[in-house]
Amino acid sequence: MDAASVLDQYVQDLANLPSEVAHILEEVRDKDLKFYETRKRIQQRDNQIHKFIRANGSLAENPKEQAAYPKIRQDFQTAMELQDEKCTLAAQALTLVAKHVKKLNDDIDKLDAEGLLGGAPPQKPISANRSRATSSATPAPEPPSRNYTRDRANSRRGGSPAASRSSTPGTRPPKKRATDKNNEAASMSKESSVGASEQLRNMPETVAVGSLDAAIRAGPGEDDEVLYCFCQQPSFGEMVACDNDDCQYEWFHYDCVGLAEPPQGVWFCPSCSKGRKGDKKKR
């Protein structure tokens, strides 16, 4: 016994199942029609009795009433029998289908017990913090250094501010609290403990979906697992740096902060801008 032979046999066994079920349902339909005809006769006889009472009063004797009662009782009995037969046919159809399902489950259990179903594990849904099992031949571009970006922004303040936020990032941004290998590992561990699910739960639904779509389009980034942005994912696609030196996240994916192009001039992330509303008004 192997999986292929079990599948082939199961398909053959199911060949006649549609026609068998259709035949049972046709019988149910036929009994349905008989039931409605029987109920219609009962209603007609009952209407005749009530019509006579409305015309002659309830004390007047109806010569046809006594003859109608046995027929009404007989029709009720017929209707109940038809309903029971319909239930029996429905149970037959259920048993017929359940028999094939049980046979398939039994065969699957046998194959599993013999170790013949040891295929690849099921795919898991995309997770924000999971390690990427595949590496990209062309790694995703990374955000430029914060200082490099600010220097360019200051030097070109009189020209095009958008040039300070290049859509083709260069070197990897340094983490402020990770100056060496040990500190970097500790920082990553601390950020991971926060949990991507908690961060995404606090984000608007449209932002979270946009961030995930952007990650899928960009593909896997570098081998490091340094996390950025509200979504706490590695760098991918286009990213922008917050101009607040004390920003908790530093770098942000465009989709996560609702950007479609490089921002003009000084830019603060949503978290930092809340505390700098007064400064913005002065500027």
Curated annotation (Swiss-Prot):
Keyword Transcription: no
Skewed-composition ranges (Low complexity): 127-139, 156-170
Keywords: Cell cycle, Chromatin regulator, DNA damage, DNA repair, Meiosis, Metal-binding, Nucleus, Zinc, Zinc-finger
A biological process from GO: meiotic cell cycle
A Pfam cross-reference name: ING
Site (Histone H3K4me3 binding): 228, 239, 243, 251
Record protein name field: Chromatin modification-related protein YNG2
Organism: Yarrowia lipolytica (strain CLIB 122 / E 150)
Originating gene: YNG2
